[in-house]
Amino acid sequence: MVCRFYDPEQGSVSIGGINLKHVVAGELRSQIALVSQHPLLFSGSIMDNIRVGNPDASDDRVKDAAKLARIHEDIHALEAGYQTLLGQRGEGLSGGQRQRMAIARAFLKDAPILILDEATSALDSESEAGIQEALAELCKGRTTILIAHRFSSIKHASRILVMDKTLAGGAIVADGTHDEVYATSALYRQLYDQQKLSSS
């Protein structure tokens, strides 16, 4: 809803007190960087795929963004480097590499609003730990919305909303920092403890 891919049937979504229905979708999206679980990559070079974040960016800026997203070394290891051609939907790259390319795009776009929708879901625990520092840097100074099932991705968020999808239409059942929702929400505590136990 924040990106206006669809509008709410009831109520409204506002940013800075402005109802998003009154904002041209294209203008709104120019202010948002989105890193999704399944990034949209296209046939073309790796350089051009990252440059989607900022079409005017120099090659050096693209490479800097790739370094911040921890994908530069993977690209550099390819025979054609940044000129390596990708197939449809990024064929030839792993899921984690595709996600890190999307993170590089977000660094390059430098938008005031950042949406991370399961942005590290395709990374193993070791790779995710390495990228968390980069994501923390990316989140600085901007409004960030994290959608995640992995608690390591959200534990340090300043505000966590816990949704219970078993309630009609899904409902927010807890709101606060990690410590606050852990103390007050049985659902959050149960899920957090289960995930912590399974990862140890």
Predicted regions and their residues:
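ABC-family ATPase nucleotide-binding domain "signature/switch" substructure
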Residues: 1-5, 26-41, 46-51, 56, ...
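Glycine-centered secondary-structure boundary/capping sites
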Residues: 4-7, 14, 70, 191, ...
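Conserved coupling/switch loops of ABC nucleotide-binding domains, chiefly the family-specific signature
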Residues: 9-12, 169
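Conserved ABC transporter NBD signature motif
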Residues: 11-18, 28
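Nucleotide-activated donor-binding/catalytic signature segment of Leloir-type glycosyltransferases, i.e.
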Residues: 75
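C-terminal boundary and immediately downstream tail of ABC-type ATPase nucleotide-binding domains
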Residues: 183-200
